[in-house]
Regions:
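Short alpha-helical
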Residues: 6, 108, 190
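Glycine-/small-residue-rich active-site loops that bind phosphorylated ligands and cofactors
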Residues: 7, 105, 180
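Small/polar loops that bind or transfer phosphate-bearing groups
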Residues: 3, 104, 184
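Gly/Ser/Thr-enriched, mixed-charge loops and adjacent short helices
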Residues: 35-157
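Buried hydrophobic packing segments
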Residues: 11-15, 113, 191-195
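N-terminal small/polar loop signature for handling phosphorylated ligands or for N-terminal nucleophile
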Residues: 1-34, 116-175
Length: 197
């Protein structure tokens, strides 16, 4: 059981690390009246239809009554932060003369994104960095139509980049220095090109 609100990538990483499956309750990028259950297999990727079909086929089954077992409350963040150190060159990010503006969209990434950058002394500005079950009356979806405030902030701040994620932080959006939305597919292509070179 997680000690805190938890982004999907943090739980997925720990599932793989601990060779365990995980269950998460999340509305993801949907409106606040929604809530779903996300099953994360031990390989940390999306569950295949073969796996989810088995789960669905057992929804109506009766569970035997028994004594409650002890539940361990766990902090999944430290292992994830250590893993990120092997992937991200925080020093290079710190050396950039770019203003980072992060829109938390009232999501599960609040407390994680700011911790990651703060510990590494990377300055950033932020929007919507408090938990709100109604997502401030908006949608926790990092698409341009829901990022108008972030887009305006980037346009009005010289040499800046805008970043946002959805409710459980497994989808992202990027706003370039001109206030233009850069899709996740474009970002992945840019990263692949960079890694190849």
């Amino acid at each position: 059981l997680s000690k805190n609100v938890l982004p999907t990538p943090v739980l997925a990483y720990n599932a793989k690390l601990l060779n365990a499956s995980a269950i998460m309750f999340t509305a993801s990028h949907n409106p606040p009246e929604y809530l779903g259950m996300k099953y994360i297999p031990d390989y940390a990727g999306p569950a295949t239809s073969e796996i989810t079909d088995k789960i669905v086929s057992n929804i109506d089954c009766e569970f035997p009554q028994g004594e409650a077992q002890e539940v361990e409350v766990f902090n999944f963040a430290p292992a994830y932060y250590e893993h990120l150190k092997t992937l991200i060159d925080y020093k290079k990010i710190k050396e950039l003369k770019t203003n980072i503006i992060f829109d938390g969209l009232y999501s599960a990434s609040i407390g994680y994104f700011d911790e990651i950058l703060g510990v590494n002394e990377i300055k950033f500005n932020s929007l919507h960095m408090e938990h709100d079950v109604n997502f401030g009356g908006g949608m926790p979806d990092p698409k341009p139509k829901y990022l108008k405030e972030l887009i305006e902030k980037v346009k009005s701040t010289q040499n800046s980049i805008g970043l946002a994620n959805d409710g459980d932080a497994d989808r992202f959006g990027v706003i370039n220095e001109n206030g233009e939305y850069v899709s996740p597919n474009e970002i992945i292509a840019i990263l692949l090109k960079y890694l190849k070179e």
